[in-house]
Amino acid sequence: MINDSIKVKGNLDIVLKDADGNVKETRSVRNLLVDDGAEYIASRMITNSGLMSHMAIGEGTTSPVAGNDALENQDGTRVTFDNGFPTRSGAEITYSATFGSGYTGTITESGIFDAATNGTMLCRTTFNPISKSSVDTMQISWTVTISAA
């Protein structure tokens, strides 16, 4: 019997830097592909729907579940990906976004979206708190890998 299945996994690397560019903190965290994200991936096989284009951070602490369609407590507005992103190498897609002075607080969640507001969320994760001041920058590099399970 043939058993076909596809596995999608994501990992994000977070780097927090101070005003002088010194690294204050780094994290590596797994994420959850949400239901809307799985549907988005399937739709891309037959349509030319919108591309993932934005990332958001927030202060939500509830663990991600497949039915999530937004962050629990988004900080500020979603930002577009850094120049040159996303990139693709084989079955790996990497997204990167930088959050500057307009984003402060105790950051505990992040997500990838296909629009500046509303739209489809691809994935969401929560993590241990990171205190971000107005002079700090936070860069999140998020790699999504699709493989045969």
Task: Give the location of each predicted region.
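Small cysteine-rich, disulfide-bonded extracellular modules of the LU/uPAR three-finger superfamily
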Residues: 1-108, 115-149
